[in-house]
Amino acid sequence: IALLLLIKNKKIGLSIFSNIVIITILNQLLKRILRRPRPTEFRIVEETGYSFPSGHSMVSMAFYGYLIYLIYRYIKNKYIKWSLIVLLSILICLIGISRIYLGVHYTSDVLGGFLLSISYLVVYISLIKKILSEE
C-alpha cells in the first residue's frame, strides 16, 4: 500500500512508511525496558521475546488506524469510506484477539498495545497533518 501511494503521492506514501518504522522501534524499546515474560500456561504457537506491549497489536493499530485516518480524510464516497473503516476496525480487533487466543499474549498486553498505539497516533497524525496539508 505504501509503495503504491509513494508512486501516486510521495508525502502519503512516506507518512505510511515512517509510521510503521516509528511504531516498530517504539514497540521494541518498550519491550526491552519493561521485559514482561510471555504467558507459559497455554500456547498454540511458540513465540520468543517479551510480552508487553504486544507488537502485533501496536503495529496493527498504528498501521490500520492511520489508514482509517487517511480513508476518512480522502475518500469522498460515504459508503466506501465507512465500509473500509468498519472492515479495518474489525481487522484490528481480530488481530488482537488472535494474539490472546494463540496464548502468546495476556489480554493486558494487547489492550496496552492498542492504547499505546492510539496515543502515538494522536501525536503522529497531529504532526503529519501539517506536512500533508502543504500539498
What are these regions (language model features)?
Residues 1-50, 66-73, 82-86:
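Hydrophobic alpha-helical bundle signature of multipass membrane enzymes
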